[in-house]
């Protein structure tokens, strides 16, 4: 008989339940975690042995949403879930980032975490539930893991922090921040904010970390009751003698190599040193393992760079700890794009474009939480040439999706509302060179390109990546880190914002012991760097251009009586299709009668407006119109009087005398004046030619189209 073991606790305004022992008993561990009807089933499987020759930790995290969780059937052709959506990919990364640093450095066994959303309450985002589940299964599994971790979402409403706000509450919140960490340290932060101060952001991180302690306590209690035995795994002992020999041969040479400021030249020199040392040691003793020598070389290399920083010496490229690399900022460099910018910071460079489209260009997103439309898109591309490599070129990888989302978070707070600027906007960042923080270069480039496109953003935004080197109580925070400093350091801390505050904060920490003091230093140092970059950007362009590009569609707005919408659309869309073909414009109609006309030519837009005014104009009884015969029948003729309206001239209303045959007086396409005699309740129009041709009749009002 299956007997589940359950922990239930209050987490802010929600009740969380963690259950194990009922399902997936062949997995290493499995839990069902629920928070107010949002339930995520999380499993972990770990291989007992590492693959021979394995050189990295093969951790895989898959987060997947099932449409049955929301009581729906997939809308795809095959009626089943397909490749991961962008949201699923981002949540997979969100889970991966805080758990990866908690595995031992030398643990190389394959581990796979799968989180499946099986029930969803639209008010509760499953990502926090999935994070709690991943922490619980790894803690229960016995796999070497220095957890558990907790996770929390923090909102900021009416100047108060809110723990795990609902979907509706988030709409009113100036902050959407996710924080994860162990009992003693924050490990990961992901956030977007509506221009909050550094103090408010830091307060949110600390608040979330304090509140999530209840999660850690309950997971520990569950492990005590249902946890599996710890694996009998021991790290391979360090070969101290070999380590000393490698350090003796390589340390000084690597120190010299890391004084080379140009990245590719430095890499070439470092690779040559490693090859020389490996060859020399193998020549002395062919029983040595080349892979082990390479691992020790990597350790020596890391120590060389870190110790220099901690001693206060210049960094790899000769900078002091708070110096920003040289900046080059240019706008309007691509003649036919709607907006463009080239942002260069040292050896990191982004070519960024902004394209304006209409509402029909917006992205329709069908998520588990419901359907929504996104009119601001930001895409990030990282081709292999940007780091001097060859490789596959194709659909975006997880990293590109994640970096694009971070850059979008950085810009989102300053974007105009749809009523202020009724365009769909797509920003694309092409990374043409990379040596540290290309995502923050994308934020800077996006701000510049949007201004160049004439998008009325509220303020310029810039981003900067901070790093950390920490040994014991000694630490140094680095501004504008290089790729090597990111790889060899203890923290990747990215901040984007305007002169007035922070718009996005992302933090990934590889060690425990990051204190509030360190985060405060990093935020303050990042603010200084951000303001410096903004100053340089403002020299290139300080405010959005006064007009959009001549190649961008211009949107003209007009309002009609909602009851006339059917007239503009026509039967089966016939009228609006004819209008767009005739005028060469794009026409969009909203339910309240608002019509948006997009055109690259102002005359075409004016023509479309005039035609819509004709179609929606009220027909006045007693007024004479210029008409055109469109159909002839035995009992009269149908005459178009403009604006897509047509009326009947009865045979008795054609002439003052008796008419035996309509075609004796009228022909198809003939222009005739007609007087409106009546418009009945069904909108049918009765016309008269003879009343319009009396001597005292007024002149026709307008020619028929």
From Swiss-Prot:
Location(s), subcellular: Cytoplasm
GO biological process, one term: mRNA catabolic process
Span of domain KH: 553-612
Cofactor: Mg(2+)
Pfam hit, one: RNase_PH_C
Top-rank taxon, per record: Bacteria
Keywords: Cytoplasm, Magnesium, Metal-binding, Nucleotidyltransferase, RNA-binding, Transferase
Keyword set includes Phosphoprotein: no
S1 motif domain: residues covered: 622-690
InterPro entries: ExoRNase_PH_dom1, ExoRNase_PH_dom2, ExoRNase_PH_dom2_sf, KH_dom, KH_dom_type_1, KH_dom_type_1_sf, NA-bd_OB-fold, PNPase
Record's catalysed reaction(s): RNA(n+1) + phosphate = RNA(n) + a ribonucleoside 5'-diphosphate
Positions with a binding annotation for Mg(2+): 486, 492
GO molecular function: 3'-5'-RNA exonuclease activity; magnesium ion binding; polyribonucleotide nucleotidyltransferase activity; RNA binding
EC code(s) of this entry: 2.7.7.8
Family: Belongs to the polyribonucleotide nucleotidyltransferase family.
Function description: Involved in mRNA degradation. Catalyzes the phosphorolysis of single-stranded polyribonucleotides processively in the 3'- to 5'-direction.
Identification of the protein by name: Polyribonucleotide nucleotidyltransferase
Organism: Yersinia pestis bv. Antiqua (strain Nepal516)
The encoding gene: pnp
């Amino acid at each position: 008989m299956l007997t589940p073991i359950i922990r239930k606790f209050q987490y802010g305004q929600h009740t969380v339940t963690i259950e194990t022992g009922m399902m997936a008993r062949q997995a290493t561990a499995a839990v069902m975690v629920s928070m107010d009807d949002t339930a995520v089933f999380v499993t972990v499987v770990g291989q007992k042995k590492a693959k021979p020759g394995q050189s990295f930790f093969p951790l895989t995290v898959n987060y997947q949403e099932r449409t049955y969780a929301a009581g729906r059937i997939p809308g795809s052709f095959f009626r089943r879930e397909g490749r991961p959506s962008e949201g699923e990919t981002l949540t997979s990364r969100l889970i991966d980032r805080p758990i990866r640093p908690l595995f031992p450095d030398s643990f190389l066994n394959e581990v796979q975490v799968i989180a499946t959303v099986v029930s969803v309450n639209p008010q509760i985002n499953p990502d926090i539930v999935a994070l709690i589940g991943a922490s619980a299964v790894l803690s229960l599994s016995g796999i070497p893991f220095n957890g558990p971790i907790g996770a929390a979402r923090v909102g900021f409403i009416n100047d108060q922090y809110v723990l795990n706000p609902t979907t509706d509450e988030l709409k009113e919140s100036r902050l959407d921040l996710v924080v994860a960490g162990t009992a003693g340290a924050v490990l990961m932060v992901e956030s977007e904010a509506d221009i909050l101060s550094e103090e408010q952001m830091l307060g949110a991180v600390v608040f979330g970390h304090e509140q999530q302690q209840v999660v850690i306590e309950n997971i520990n209690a569950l492990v005590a009751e249902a946890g599996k035995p710890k694996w009998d795994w021991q790290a391979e002992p360090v070969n101290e003698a070999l380590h000393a020999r490698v350090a003796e041969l390589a340390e000084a040479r690597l120190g010299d190599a890391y004084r080379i400021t140009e990245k590719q030249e430095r890499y070439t020199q470092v690779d040559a040193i490693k090859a020389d040392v490996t060859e020399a040691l193998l020549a002395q003793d062919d029983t040595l393992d080349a892979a082990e020598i390479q691992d020790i070389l990597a350790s020596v290399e890391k120590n060389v760079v870190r110790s220099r920083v901690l001693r206060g010496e210049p960094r790899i490229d000769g900078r002091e700890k708070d110096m920003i690399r040289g900046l080059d900022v240019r706008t309007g460099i691509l003649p036919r794009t709607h907006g463009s910018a080239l942002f260069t910071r040292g050896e990191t460079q982004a070519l960024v474009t902004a394209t304006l489209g209409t509402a029909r260009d917006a992205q329709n997103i069908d998520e588990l939480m419901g359907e929504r439309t996104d009119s601001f898109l930001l895409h990030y591309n990282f081709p292999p040439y940007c780091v001097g490599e060859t490789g596959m070129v194709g659909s975006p990888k997880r990293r590109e999706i994640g970096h694009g989302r971070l850059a979008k978070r950085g810009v989102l707070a300053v974007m105009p509302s749809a009523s202020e600027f009724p365009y769909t906007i797509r920003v694309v960042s092409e990374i043409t060179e990379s040596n540290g923080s290309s995502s923050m270069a994308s934020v800077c480039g996006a701000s510049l390109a949007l201004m160049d496109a004439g998008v009325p953003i509220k303020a310029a935004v810039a981003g900067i990546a901070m790093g950390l080197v920490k040994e014991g109580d000694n630490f140094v925070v680095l501004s504008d880190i290089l790729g090597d400093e990111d790889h060899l350091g203890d923290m990747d801390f990215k901040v984007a914002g305007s002169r007035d505050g922070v718009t996005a904060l992302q933090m990934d920490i590889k060690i425990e012991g990051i204190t509030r003091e360190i985060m405060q230093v990093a935020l303050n140092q990042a603010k200084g760097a951000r303001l410096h970059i903004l100053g340089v950007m403002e020299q290139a362009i300080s405010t959005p251009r006064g007009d959009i590009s001549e190649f961008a569609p211009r949107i003209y707005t007009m309002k009609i009586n909602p009851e006339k919408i059917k007239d503009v659309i026509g039967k089966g869309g016939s009228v609006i299709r004819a209008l767009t073909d005739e005028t060469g414009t794009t026409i969009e109609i909203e339910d309240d009668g608002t019509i948006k006309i997009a055109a690259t030519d102002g005359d075409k837009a004016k023509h479309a407006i005039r035609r819509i005014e004709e179609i929606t104009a009220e027909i006045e009884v007693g007024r004479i119109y210029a008409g055109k015969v469109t159909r002839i029948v035995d009992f009269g003729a149908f005459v178009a009087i403009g604006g897509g309206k047509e009326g009947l001239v009865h045979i008795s209303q054609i002439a003052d005398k008796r008419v035996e045959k309509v075609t004796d007086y009228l022909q198809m396409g003939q222009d005739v004046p007609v007087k409106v005699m009546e418009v009945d309740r069904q909108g049918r129009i009765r016309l008269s030619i003879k009343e319009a041709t009396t001597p005292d009749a007024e002149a026709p009002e307008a020619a028929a189209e």
